[in-house]
């Protein structure tokens, strides 16, 4: 599959690398065509890179791995025409570090980033997932022992099915994937971040995750 990963940070690079390893044709998008991180990644892993629009245009599926506070601007740069009809996997979190750590979490208007993007791009099929864990666990759930879960939120059932298949290819068993319902449920997933950040500070590692007891706990 042709997949665009928008964002050149650690999350974007981790997801793009995993997708290449699974045989996908991956393009990394950034604000400028000559982004050094994107060029380095493409040279090391065999993907391509360009602007947000360059990456999104030919893609069959788009991953938003930009920071949640700038995701709308990034997707606007990618272009509505380049997103129309496509599944957009939103893994972002709106984190404001202006007052230090832990950051403030969430958009000023109380919506989730996923809802903001869906409203801005109504012909795009937005699915929220993977934002409740560190990037290494996203693509290698076996790093965390025992039962733990990944969440899905979205208004389009077909789009969620596509994303569930992608998660399965990352190693997420079907009984570990919890569909929270429509896209309004993404608010709950994004608001897990304050708790995640506190636990990260206490544990000193990101190798942990949330699990719902009673859902596949014996798997």
Q: Predicted regions span which residues?
A:
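NAD(P)+-binding Rossmann beta1-loop-alpha1 motif at the extreme N-terminus of oxidoreductases
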Residues: 1-40, 44
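Rossmann-fold NAD(P)-dependent oxidoreductase module
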Residues: 14, 18, 120, 166
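Rossmann-like NAD(P)-binding element
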Residues: 44-87, 92-101
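General beta-strand structural signal in soluble alpha/beta enzymes
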Residues: 49, 125-129, 176-180
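Short beta-strand and adjoining strand-loop segment in the mid-core
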Residues: 102-110, 140-158
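Short, glycine-/small-residue-rich phosphate/pyrophosphate-handling segment
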Residues: 108-132, 139-140
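Active-site-lining helix/loop region of Rossmann-like oxidoreductase modules
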Residues: 137, 148-219
């Amino acid at each position: 599959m042709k997949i665009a990963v928008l964002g050149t940070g650690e999350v974007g690079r981790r997801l793009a690398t995993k997708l290449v390893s699974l045989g996908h044709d991956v393009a990394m998008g950034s604000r400028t065509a000559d982004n050094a991180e994107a060029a380095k990644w493409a040279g090391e892993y065999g993907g391509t890179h360009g602007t947000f629009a360059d990456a999104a245009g030919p893609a069959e599926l788009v991953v938003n791995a930009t920071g949640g506070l700038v995701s709308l601007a990034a997707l606007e740069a990618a272009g509505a025409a380049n997103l129309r009809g496509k599944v957009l996997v939103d893994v972002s979190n709106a984190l404001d570090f202006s007052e230090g750590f832990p950051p403030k979490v969430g958009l000023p208007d109380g919506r989730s980033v996923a809802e903001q993007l869906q409203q801005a791009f109504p012909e795009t099929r937005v699915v929220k997932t993977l934002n409740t864990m560190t990037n290494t666990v996203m693509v290698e759930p076996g790093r965390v022992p025992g039962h733990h879960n990944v969440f899905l939120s979205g208004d389009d059932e077909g789009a969620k099915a596509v994303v569930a298949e992608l998660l399965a290819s990352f190693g997420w068993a079907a009984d570990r994937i919890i569909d929270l319902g429509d896209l309004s449920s993404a608010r709950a997933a994004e608001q897990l971040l304050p708790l995640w950040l506190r636990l990260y500070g206490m544990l000193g590692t990101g190798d942990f995750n949330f699990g719902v007891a009673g859902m596949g706990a014996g798997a």
